[in-house]
């Protein structure tokens, strides 16, 4: 019994809110606010206590808040100062009713009390002895600390144990999304559970919830190409384009620049590309505050080597001495530049495009600055911009702030002063967060490992567009990243190759065991790059742009085999290694080389038949260097921390359930025997003729006759009633007379056997005439004295049949049917006459 004392009660060991079916507490909404469907939010409130505690109520609510840190520049005596004012607004709230929790409390002690806690009151009646119906109808709680019922106190006592309180709610699809990456602005959601206790402080548990809105699979932005076409009069015509308007945070986009020079002697200089975020926010009063920040940037110092050519001319002073143009370079009618721009995978460095009510608006655009080197020496700049849309994709892992960092950052919002400078860009420096204090969301997606192993280009690095391998790698990576965001194009299913067509006709058939291993190895080898940027000095692994790989060329397979075999490619998913001792002339080696070369074809933006496969749009190739760094044995064997283990999960395919072998063995041994019901009306009597002298057949006939009263159950077949030829019956019957044992199954009769000779009229009813019965009684007494029994183990039914047959033979010794005993025609004629009579 919980006793009231001056000492404070112990705090619960565990008081937490756990959400179900959510990755890192992320509530994903697909589609725009006016089209998105509702989502289910469910979970449990977990409570673990070591001693009884008293609670009044348990409340749960979900609320969302918008917070702004609005700067205002003030002119003072000491100069301009920037003052920050806090703006806060509740944008969503949902309260769970306590009725379900109270009903849960009423049933707690039926499950957990076990009679350990008693109550003493004026009456000697214990609550445990009360009828169950009375306890259910009572609105009072359970136990009071002072020995009285808690009807007047209105609180509950929870005994030692673990408790789970489930909850669920339907969240509308128009819910405002979370914004955590903007400086001086934030939209956050939280679940708050409160346990109200008498005479003690309340217990409060908060759970940070992220509401992320992503694009629907049919969004136009995922397949819409954005481009700008314009001309600089008497200088250049240019076209700048990107494949899709929507770009996922943490992915990359390919930038295509096409310039047609008009002025003679014009050269291409450095190209600078930057991704700029423009955000606007305002409070209930004042104007709109604009702020910009650089999200990503890329600089191509000399994409076409024009700057190097000019420096070479100046070093030789050819233009200054001779005064003529001695340019021996090839004339180019157009300049093509391709660059891969990486978007940082962090919501602290950029935010998604959004519009939160009338308070926050975020947009992005890519700015281009192209330098043009004129013949007279001065530099002209071509500037352009493309609007893009950044969104959060569930297929790409993204770094986010932890809940502690978010709370710490929001506390800094409010009145503060800061001295402004000329280079101030309206950013509050106190809002920047260390990169080490970040968490990862969507890391359980199957593409997380693939994107982490993608070879990327660091911002600010130079892309050598003249290198064929660098260009092919950039194009391939962009195509692969884009395919993760865009749904598959089902119109291209005509290019699918049947798996059986991969093998060659000339190769010999391998064993079944080796073919399974080879198929797995082929799939793994296709996912590896031979070229390695870190091992470019190695002649084996160095990329060779002169080698052309084709599916139909067997010579290329042979020439490529040495470099592939000597590279000792370690397969990721299998323990197969291609060694140097592998014979290239063997059929297996040729098959491997063919598949390796087919998988290493440089993919392009348009599909070709050289590298078609049945891989879906989410599959992509990975580099061997990244896989080597990401899948080290030491990293895989390292035991993760508890928090990381709770937030991470193994990446793999769902497998069917594995059933115990014992149960399978028992089920296999139990064979279901299906019995065919016995035919009620037999068209032929040959199948019912028993073999003479068979005691087993008579026993079976008795067994079958005893089952005829079960009219609704299927009757088993009589195995002894097999077809017997008339010749065998003739051989067994020496007196040219036949004894037939016909079994007729009828609903009117419980007897299934009738005994009669061929030359007498049968009675198909169960009641025979008294005259026939007396006749058989007389003949039985005479025939038993004249004919001895052949076997001692004959049953009484067999004895009666033989005695009846002998009496009939004695009475019909002069019958004309005896003359044609073995004739089938005479037999049928006898049956016809018998039926007519």
From Swiss-Prot:
InterPro entries in the cross-refs: Arrestin-like_C, Arrestin-like_N, Arrestin_C-like, Arrestin_domain-protein
Protein name: Protein ROD1
Short sequence motif PY-motif: positions: 487-490, 656-659
GO cellular component: cytoplasm; cytosol; plasma membrane
Pfam families linked to this entry: Arrestin_C (PF02752), Arrestin_N (PF00339)
Biased composition (Basic and acidic residues): 774-792
Extent of Polar residues compositional bias: 716-726
Crosslinked positions (Glycyl lysine isopeptide (Lys-Gly) (interchain with G-Cter in ubiquitin)): 401
Start-end of Low complexity biased regions: 685-703, 763-773, 805-815
First and last residue of the signal peptide: none
Membrane topology value: Peripheral membrane protein
Region (Disordered): 675-726, 763-837
GO biological process terms, semicolon-separated: cellular response to glucose stimulus; positive regulation of receptor internalization; response to xenobiotic stimulus; ubiquitin-dependent endocytosis
Keywords: Isopeptide bond, Membrane, Phosphoprotein, Ubl conjugation
SMART domains: Arrestin_C
Keyword match Ribosomal protein: no
Organism of derivation: Saccharomyces cerevisiae (strain ATCC 204508 / S288c)
Residues bearing the modification Phosphoserine: 138, 141, 436, 536, 720, 725
Function: Mediates resistance to o-dinitrobenzene, calcium and zinc.
């Amino acid at each position: 019994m919980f006793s009231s004392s001056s000492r404070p009660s112990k705090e619960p060991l565990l008081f937490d809110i756990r959400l179900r079916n959510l990755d890192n507490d992320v509530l994903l909404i697909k589609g725009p606010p006016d089209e998105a469907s509702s989502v289910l939010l469910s979970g449990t409130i977990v409570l673990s206590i070591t001693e009884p505690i008293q609670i009044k109520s348990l409340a749960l609510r979900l609320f969302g808040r918008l917070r702004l840190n609005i700067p205002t520049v003030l002119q003072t005596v000491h100069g301009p100062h920037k003052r920050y004012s806090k703006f806060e607004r509740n944008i969503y709230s949902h309260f769970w009713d306590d009725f379900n929790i109270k009903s849960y409390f009423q049933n707690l002690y039926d499950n957990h009390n076990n009679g350990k806690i008693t109550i003493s009151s004026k009456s000697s009646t214990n609550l445990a002895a009360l009828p169950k119906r009375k306890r259910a109808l009572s609105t009072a709680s359970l136990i009071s600390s002072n020995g009285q019922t808690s009807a007047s106190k209105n609180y509950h006592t929870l005994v030692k144990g673990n408790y789970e309180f489930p909850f669920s709610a339907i969240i509308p699809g128009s819910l405002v999304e979370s914004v955590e990456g903007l400086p001086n602005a934030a939209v956050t959601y939280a679940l708050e559970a409160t346990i109200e206790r008498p005479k003690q402080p309340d217990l409060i548990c908060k759970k940070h919830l992220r509401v992320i809105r992503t694009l629907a699979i049919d969004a136009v932005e995922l397949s819409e190409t954005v481009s700008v076409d314009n001309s600089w009069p008497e200088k250049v015509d240019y076209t700048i384009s990107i494949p899709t308007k929507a770009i996922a945070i943490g992915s990359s986009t390919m930038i295509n620049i096409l310039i047609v020079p008009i002025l003679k002697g014009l050269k291409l200089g450095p190209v600078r590309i930057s991704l700029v975020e423009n955000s606007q926010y305002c409070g209930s009063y004042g104007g709109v505050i604009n702020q910009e920040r650089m999200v990503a940037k890329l600089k191509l110092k000399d994409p076409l080597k024009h700057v190097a050519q000019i420096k070479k001319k100046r070093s030789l002073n050819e233009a200054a001495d001779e005064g003529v143009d001695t340019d021996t370079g090839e004339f180019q009618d157009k300049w093509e530049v391709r660059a891969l721009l990486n978007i940082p995978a962090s919501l602290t460095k950029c935010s998604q495009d959004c519009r939160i009510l009338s308070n926050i608006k975020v947009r992005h655009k890519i700015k281009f600055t192209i330098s043009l080197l004129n013949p007279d020496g001065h530099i002209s700049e071509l500037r352009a911009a493309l609007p893009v849309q950044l969104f959060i994709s569930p297929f790409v892992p993204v770094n986010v702030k932890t809940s502690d960092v978010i709370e710490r950052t929001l506390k800094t919002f409010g009145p503060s002063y800061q001295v402004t400078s000329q280079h101030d860009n309206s950013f509050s420096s106190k809002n920047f967060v260390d990169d080490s204090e970040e968490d990862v969301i969507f890391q359980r997606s199957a593409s997380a490992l693939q994107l982490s192993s993608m070879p990327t280009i660091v911002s600010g690095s130079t892309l050598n567009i003249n290198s064929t391998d660098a260009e092919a790698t950039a194009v391939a990576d962009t195509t692969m990243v884009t395919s993760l965001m865009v749904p598959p194009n089902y119109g291209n299913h005509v290019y699918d190759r049947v798996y059986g067509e991969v093998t060659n006709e000339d190769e010999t058939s391998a064993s079944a065991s080796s073919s399974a291993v080879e198929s797995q190895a082929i799939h793994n080898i296709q996912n590896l790059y031979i070229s390695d940027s870190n091992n470019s000095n190695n002649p084996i692994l160095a990329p060779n742009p002169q080698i052309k790989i084709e599916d139909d060329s067997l010579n290329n397979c042979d020439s490529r085999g040495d470099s592939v075999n000597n590279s000792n490619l370690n397969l990721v998913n299998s323990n197969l290694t291609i060694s140097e001792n592998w014979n290239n002339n063997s059929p297996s080696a040729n098959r491997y080389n063919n598949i390796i070369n087919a998988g290493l074809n440089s993919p392009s933006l348009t599909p070709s038949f050289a590298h078609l496969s049945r891989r879906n749009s989410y599959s992509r190739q990975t580099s061997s260097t990244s896989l080597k760094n990401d899948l080290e044995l030491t990293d895989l064997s390292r035991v993760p921390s508890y928090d990381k283990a709770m937030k991470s999960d193994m990446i793999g395919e769902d497998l069917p359930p594995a059933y115990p072998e014992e149960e399978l063995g028992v089920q296999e041994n139990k064979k279901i025997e299906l019995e065919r019901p016995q035919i009620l009306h037999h068209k032929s009597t040959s199948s019912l003729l028993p073999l003479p002298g068979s005691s087993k057949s008579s026993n079976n006939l008795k067994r079958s006759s005893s089952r005829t009263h079960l009219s609704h159950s299927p009757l088993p077949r009589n195995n002894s009633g097999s077809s017997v030829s008339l010749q065998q019956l003739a051989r067994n019957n020496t007196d040219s007379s036949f004894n037939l044992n016909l079994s007729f199954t009828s609903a009117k009769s419980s007897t299934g056997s009738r005994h009669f000779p061929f030359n007498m009229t049968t009675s198909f009813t169960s009641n025979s005439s008294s005259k026939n019965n007396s006749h058989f009684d007389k003949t039985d007494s005479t025939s038993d004295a004249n004919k001895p029994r052949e076997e001692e183990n004959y049953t009484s039914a067999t004895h009666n049949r033989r005695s009846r047959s002998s009496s009939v033979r004695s009475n019909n010794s002069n019958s004309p049917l005896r003359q044609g005993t073995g004739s089938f025609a005479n037999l049928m004629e006898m049956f016809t006459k018998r039926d007519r009579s």
